[in-house]
Curated annotation (Swiss-Prot):
<feature type="site" description="Cleavage">
    <location>
        <begin position="424"/>
        <end position="425"/>
    </location>
</feature>
<keyword id="KW-1160">Virus entry into host cell</keyword>
<dbReference type="Pfam" id="PF12226">
    <property type="entry name" value="Astro_capsid_p"/>
</dbReference>
<comment type="similarity">
    <text>Belongs to the astroviridae capsid polyprotein family.</text>
</comment>
<keyword id="KW-1162">Viral penetration into host cytoplasm</keyword>
<dbReference type="GO" id="GO:0039617">
    <property type="term" value="C:T=3 icosahedral viral capsid"/>
</dbReference>
<feature type="region of interest" description="Inner core">
    <location>
        <begin position="72"/>
        <end position="264"/>
    </location>
</feature>
<dbReference type="InterPro" id="IPR029053">
    <property type="entry name" value="Viral_coat"/>
</dbReference>
<keyword id="KW-1165">Clathrin-mediated endocytosis of virus by host</keyword>
<feature type="site" description="Cleavage">
    <location>
        <begin position="394"/>
        <end position="395"/>
    </location>
</feature>
<feature type="region of interest" description="Disordered">
    <location>
        <begin position="677"/>
        <end position="713"/>
    </location>
</feature>
<dbReference type="InterPro" id="IPR004337">
    <property type="entry name" value="Astro_capsid_N"/>
</dbReference>
<feature type="site" description="Cleavage">
    <location>
        <begin position="657"/>
        <end position="658"/>
    </location>
</feature>
<dbReference type="InterPro" id="IPR022027">
    <property type="entry name" value="Astro_capsid_p"/>
</dbReference>
<keyword id="KW-1142">T=3 icosahedral capsid protein</keyword>
<feature type="site" description="Cleavage">
    <location>
        <begin position="648"/>
        <end position="649"/>
    </location>
</feature>
<feature type="compositionally biased region" description="Basic residues">
    <location>
        <begin position="20"/>
        <end position="36"/>
    </location>
</feature>
């Protein structure tokens, strides 16, 4: 109390938790109880009125004295040893795809858990300090939402950010979220959600424990949840918007005290698994189990980073790992996943905790026990079902969804020599994958046990469009074969499970110059049916992102009998039928087959020609599934690449006009070679020189030039091609184009320069050959300065 006469300020602190010492109990028996104490500050007036400045100083003096006395009595907890200000970028807030309440983010504020969902275990200063000190608290917290779209670009969605003080999943509606401390955000505008120490205080005089292996109510701290309501629509295209809405950042000052190094806490992992099939099962009195494919990113990460259990299970029970994972479902499918009662609300709420069940996977699935809270997971008390899934829903397939998962704890906190885990480490894939494709239902007009329709031409009927797989406007091919794929499984080259790679940058599927699908993997198969013809089949694994329909000239392959006992492989039916093809969102295997005159260059080849009626095709590796529609569920194995390097484009000429087309590098516009224009006055001597230039030995035919760095490469490639059964002439030609000699480089350089000067093609080639002969005679290639232009 404060008396008016002497200006004394008295502060009374009662720290006995509401209990007083009994009168009949001795003093010694009440030790350890809370105690009461008073702080009196003498702020007596000295006879004259204080001005505003003196009053401010007096009030500050009172506060300092009170705070000092409170600290002496231990009411405010330990003094911070170190404080760290930091801004953590946590990722993006996606759009709402269902129109109902969807959770987009759940941010746990324990410093060792504040990471972005990139799959990285890298840590910053906050995580490093969290692994060194035993207690933490927040001085303030600002959650910044930076808009990623304009205020008029999208509409139909409201965003609400709220504080969950217990960090426990709950069944909360949009109205329930409004009962929390929250902030409503308008899409297209930046916002900051500000929290004070009173909102963030821990149970130990404002402090929280850092080690996540301890009691959940003492370690996690509060959490920040971000929800959206209403389907996000594009204002310009009048269709659903699927991009990000906000970038989320945490700006705060973490304080730490009580040094206790737990270095393994910095290695906790957070990542995202897209398009993973999730299902739940359980029966009356049994734990709720979540199942995911063992080839999914989440399953492989959990197996690799889940530690062996430190306790044994009872008879008849499964053993679980000691590592706990928080799972956040950010996709619309949370409301569609069928869950046994009574924990339907937990799954629809969008986030829960799981622990891996030890043992080998069954039927290609990994199993996890589901827990409604982190404390239940630490205590190994899974959610128990009171019934099973209704009979009519048991046959429903697993729902593809997007999971964000966070490793919550690390049972071993020191630097162990070898971490005991339930599986092997995740291999780092390269650009080559073994891809297992599961055939889906045939796409109309294809049907089971019948021929497979393919697009025959490179043009569509009037007013329609073909499907193009393109790198740019000059390098593309037209889709011919189209096979629906129900499931794609990725493996590394040594057949270790791998996660899905990102789409190939620069490649896309176009219809009338509009992107409809992404290309994830490619492969080409080059075969040589004869010395005068090469067959090239390109396959593309694509994922349609926007449904579309095309009308094309369709035909099919058939077996054609030759004369006598000879049987040709198969031909394309000459007559075509105009039919519609409807592509819905999902995976497809698209193919294109072309024939051309050899030789074929190294690298990826772009060839866009229609299927020829009079050409017999061989059944190569990329066309086997185009004879008849494969049965549903059939699995095809391909080795595919996720990069397209050394792109080459074939000049489009008829076979009769030019038996040796020119290849041009499509990656560098400055190096594109053009085929010299043929004239009627070309002499027989010029033709002989052409043949001489194209058919040369490993060394230049114009003289003995000194060896260069590619000599060994030429010999190795030539020997390899001949050993594989190729003719010496063809092997030599391929070797020449792969590793040209200095004379050939000089000849080509002079050829290009003289063409640019305006000389006729015949004279240009004669001068180029003469320059190459001169270089071979002098043994001194002109590699700098003037290239020796002929006049």
């Amino acid at each position: 109390m404060a008396s008016k006469s002497d200006k004394q300020v008295t502060v009374e602190v009662n720290n006995n938790n509401g209990r007083s010492r009994s009168r009949s109990r001795g003093r010694s028996q009440s030790r350890g109880r809370g105690r009461s104490f008073k702080i009196t500050v003498n702020s007596k007036n000295r006879g004259r009125r204080q001005n505003g400045r003196n009053k401010l100083q007096s009030n500050q003096r009172v506060r300092n004295i009170v705070n000092k006395q409170l600290r002496k009595q231990g009411v405010t907890g330990p003094k911070p040893a170190i404080c760290q200000r930091a801004t953590a970028t946590l990722g993006t807030i996606g759009s709402n795809t269902s129109g109902s309440t969807e959770i987009e983010a759940c941010i746990l504020l324990n410093p060792v858990l504040v990471k972005d969902a990139t799959g990285s275990t890298q840590f910053g200063p906050v995580q490093a300090l969290g692994a060194q000190y035993s207690m933490w608290k927040l001085k303030y917290l600002n959650v910044k939402l930076t808009s990623m779209v304009g205020s008029s670009a999208v509409n139909g969605t409201a965003v609400r950010i709220s504080l969950n003080p217990t960090s426990t999943p709950s069944s909360t509606s949009w109205s329930g979220l409004g009962a929390r401390k929250h902030l409503d955000v308008t899409v297209g505008k930046n916002a900051v959600f500000r929290l004070k120490p009173a909102d963030l205080g821990g149970p130990r005089d404002g402090w929280w424990l850092t080690n996540t292996n301890d009691n959940a109510s003492d370690t996690l701290g509060p959490s920040i949840e971000i929800h959206t309501l209403g389907k996000t629509m594009s204002s310009y295209l009048n269709q659903q918007f699927t991009g990000g809405l906000f970038l989320v950042e945490l700006a705060s000052e973490w304080c730490f005290t009580g040094y206790a190094a737990n270095p393994n806490l910095v290695n906790l992992m957070k990542s995202t698994d897209k398009q993973v099939n999730v299902s739940f099962e359980g029966d009356n009195g049994t734990p709720l189990i979540m199942k995911v494919p063992d080839t999914s990113h989440f399953a492989r990460t959990a197996v690799a980073r889940s530690s062996l259990p430190t306790t044994l299970a009872r008879a008849g029970q499964n053993t679980t790992s000691d590592t706990v994972w928080q799972v956040l479902n950010t996709a619309v499918s949370a409301a569609e996943i069928v869950t046994p009662p009574p924990f339907n609300w937990l799954i629809k709420g969008g986030w829960w905790f799981v622990k891996l069940i030890a043992g080998r996977s069954r039927a290609g699935m990994r199993s996890f026990y589901v827990y409604p809270s982190y404390q239940d997971a630490l205590s190994n008390k899974p959610a128990l079902c009171t019934g099973s899934v209704p009979g009519g829903m048991r046959v429903r397939a697993a729902i593809p969804t997007t999971l964000q998962f966070t490793q919550m704890n690390q049972p071993s906190l020191g630097h162990g020599e070898v971490t005991a885990t339930l599986g092997r480490s995740i291999p780092t894939p390269g650009d080559t994958f073994k891809v297992v494709l599961t055939i889906g239902q045939p796409l109309a007009p294809n049907t089971l046990n019948n021929q497979t329709w393919v697009n025959k031409t490179t043009t569509a009927p009037q007013g329609q469009h073909v499907v193009k797989i393109a790198k740019d406007t000059s390098n593309y091919t037209t889709m011919q074969g189209f096979t629906p794929i129900s499931n794609v499984t990725w493996y590394t080259e040594d057949f270790q499970p791998s996660e899905e790679p990102p789409p190939i940058s620069g490649l896309q599927v176009l219809v009338d110059s509009r992107k409809k699908a992404d290309v994830y993997a490619v492969q080409q198969y080059l075969n040589h049916p004869s010395n005068t013809k090469d067959q090239l089949t390109s396959i593309f694994l694509v994922k349609v992102t926007t449904s579309f329909q095309v009308n094309n000239h369709l035909s099919y392959f058939y077996r054609a009998a030759g004369t006598g006992t000879a049987v040709e492989n198969f031909k394309i039916r000459g007559a075509t039928s105009e039919q519609n093809i409807s592509f819905s969102e999902g995976w497809y295997l698209m193919t294109n087959t072309a024939t051309f005159n050899p030789p074929a260059p190294p690298g990826w080849i772009w060839k866009n020609v229609e299927l020829d009626n009079n050409t017999p095709y061989i059944v190569d590796q990329g066309m086997m599934h185009l004879i008849m529609s494969p049965p549903v569920g059939t699995q095809l194995l391909f080795e595919m690449k996720t990069t397209v390097s050394g792109t080459r484009n074939v000049s489009h000429f008829d076979h009769d006009e030019n038996p040796s087309p020119v290849w041009c590098d499509a990656l560098d516009a400055a190096d594109v070679w053009e085929l010299p224009t043929e004239t009627d006055t070309e002499s027989e001597e010029d033709e002989d020189e052409d043949d001489e230039a194209d058919r040369f030995d490993l060394h230049s035919s114009y003289g003995s030039e000194p060896e260069d760095d590619d000599e060994n490469n030429r010999v190795t490639l030539l020997s390899t091609l001949i050993n594989q059964g190729m003719t010496v002439e063809r092997a030599t030609m391929i070797t020449k184009r792969a590793f040209p000699t200095c004379a050939d480089k000089q000849k080509r350089s002079v050829h290009m320069d003289l063409l640019a000067s305006g000389l006729s093609p015949g004279n240009v080639w004669s001068h180029a050959c003469e320059e190459a002969r001169t270089m071979g005679t002098n043994h001194m290639p002109n590699v700098s300065g003037d290239r020796g232009h002929a006049e």
